[in-house]
Amino acid sequence: MDFEAVIGLEVHAELSTNTKIYCGCTTEFGGQPNTHVCPICLGLPGSLPQLNKRVVEYGIKAGLALNCSINKVCRMDRKNYFYPDCPKNYQITQDEVPICRDGYIEIELENGEKKKIGIERIHMEEDAGKLLHTNAGTLVDYNRAGVPLIEIVSRPDIRTPEEATKYLEKLKSILSSIEVSDCKMEQGSLRCDGNISVMPKGSEKFGVRSEIKNMNSFKALEKALSYEYDRHVEAVTKGEILEQETRRWDEANSVTVLMRSKEKANDYRYFPEGDLVTLNISDEWIEEVRKTIPELPHEKAERFVNEFRIPKYDAMVLTLTMDMAKFFEETTLKSEDAKATSNWLMGDISRLMNEKTIEVKDLKFNPEQLAELIKLINAGTISNNIGKKVLDDMFKSGKSPKDIVEEKGLVQNNDEGAILEVVKKIIENNPQSIEDFKNGKKRALGFLVGLVMKETKGKANPQIVNKLVSEEANKM
C-alpha cells in the first residue's frame, strides 16, 4: 500500500519591535541573563499588562502579506500551564478570536506547478523564557519572556517534507521583506514545529499525528519530517497503534525522540484575559498598514525575470533576502549586464559570504564597485579569472576594482604577437602534448592553454590563448 504524508506547520516569528508585547523592556538579543525584565514580564503580583500597538500593526501587516482576512474585533486569552520558563504560570495569547484568519502561501513544485498552502490563523502571543540545563541544575533566563511573537498556523495541505521546506522558505522571505521579523533561525527568532501523520494515497481520513519540535533549520525540518514519515509508515504497515504525542528532533542521532503525550486544548484551560480590553481594528488602520507593505519577494522575482531577462531560478534565489535583491538591482542598473551580475552574486560572492559568515549588508564594497568589476571584464581589461582575484581583494579592503588592477598590474594582455611567442615556446617544450593531440586527445590542448596562462601569470586573454594554441597545434 502506498502512503502519503499530511503535514501542517506552526511557525513562531519574533517581531522586530523595540520593546516587549506588554511592557517597556527591551527586546534586544544577547543581554546578560535576567537584565531585560520588569514586574510585568515576570508576572509579579499587582502588575498590569499594556498591549504594544506596534505588535498589532505588525500582526496586521503579516496577515495582509499572507493573504489573510483581518479580524476587526479580537481579544487576548490566557493559556494556563506550569513550566519554569513561564513566570506567570500562564501565557497571554489568542485562542478563539485571533488577529488573522484564512490566508495562503503559494509555492512552486519541482514540476513547475504552483500549489497553495492554506494558513488557518495568525495569532499574537508572548514568548517564554529560556532554560539552560547544566550538570548542577537548570537555570532560567527571563530576558526573552514577553518578547512579542506571531504564530502562523498552516492548514494540513503539505504532502512532502520538500513542500514543507519550500513553504517555510517562502514564509521567511515574506516576513523578512516586510520587516516584521529578522527571521534569524540561529538566534531563535524564527522557530518551526511540525505536525505529521500518514494516510493511504487517495484517502481523505488523516492518521494519528505527531508534533515535532527542535527543527531549527531548513535541513533539520526536512530530515525530521522524512524520518517521522518513515516511522509512521513502518508502524502502520506492521499494524501497530500510533498515539498522538510530542517528539523532538535529535540532530546528533538523526532521530525523533518522545517528549510527552500530546496535550489537548482543554488541558490549557483557555479563558479571556481580563486585564486587557477587546481589540477593535478599524478599516482605516488596516488600509494605513497595507500602504506600508513593499513589493513582496515573489512579485520582485517576477519583475526581475520580465525586466532584466534573467532565469526564473536566478530571480528566486536573488529575492530570498531583500538586501540581496536590492544589491542585484542597483548593480545591474550600473553594469548593464544582469546575467553577469546574477552570476557573481549567486556564485563567488555568496561563496565568500558563507565562508566568512557575513551578510550582504556587511560587504565592504557597494553595487557601483561590483558594476565596475563587471565592466572591466566585459571590456577585456581583465580576464574573468583575474576578476575573481580582484573580488577577493575587494572583500578584504573595500577598494575599487580599478585601483586594485592598477596597483597590482593586473591589466589583461591582449597583444596577439606577444602571446603567440609564449604559445610557440610552450608547444616547443611540450612535444608529447602535441603528439597526444594528434592521437585524438583533445584535452592535451587544455593542458597547453593552462601552461600559457601560468607563464603569463594569468594576464593573457584566455580567448586569444585558446585560439592561438589551437591554430599552432593544428599546424604541427
UniProtKB/Swiss-Prot annotation:
Keywords on record: ATP-binding, Ligase, Nucleotide-binding, Protein biosynthesis
Protein name, UniProt field: Aspartyl/glutamyl-tRNA(Asn/Gln) amidotransferase subunit B
Source species taxonomy: Bacteria, Bacillati, Bacillota, Clostridia, Eubacteriales
InterPro entries cross-referenced by the UniProt entry: Asn/Gln-tRNA_amidoTrfase_suB/E, Asn/Gln-tRNA_Trfase_suB/E_cat, Asn/Gln_amidotransferase, Asn/Gln_tRNA_amidoTrase-B-like, GatB, GatB_C_1, GatB_Yqey_C_2, Gln-tRNA_amidoTrfase_suB_CS
Catalytic activity: L-glutamyl-tRNA(Gln) + L-glutamine + ATP + H2O = L-glutaminyl-tRNA(Gln) + L-glutamate + ADP + phosphate + H(+); L-aspartyl-tRNA(Asn) + L-glutamine + ATP + H2O = L-asparaginyl-tRNA(Asn) + L-glutamate + ADP + phosphate + 2 H(+)
EC number(s) per entry: 6.3.5.-
SUPFAM superfamilies (UniProt xref): GatB/YqeY motif, Glutamine synthetase/guanido kinase
Pfam family, one: GatB_N
Superkingdom field: Bacteria
Gene Ontology molecular function: any one: glutaminyl-tRNA synthase (glutamine-hydrolyzing) activity
Gene: gatB
Keyword Electron transport among UniProt keywords: no
Role played: Allows the formation of correctly charged Asn-tRNA(Asn) or Gln-tRNA(Gln) through the transamidation of misacylated Asp-tRNA(Asn) or Glu-tRNA(Gln) in organisms which lack either or both of asparaginyl-tRNA or glutaminyl-tRNA synthetases. The reaction takes place in the presence of glutamine and ATP through an activated phospho-Asp-tRNA(Asn) or phospho-Glu-tRNA(Gln).
Keyword rRNA-binding (UniProt): no
GO biological process, one term: glutaminyl-tRNAGln biosynthesis via transamidation
Family under the similarity heading: Belongs to the GatB/GatE family. GatB subfamily.
Subunit organization: Heterotrimer of A, B and C subunits.
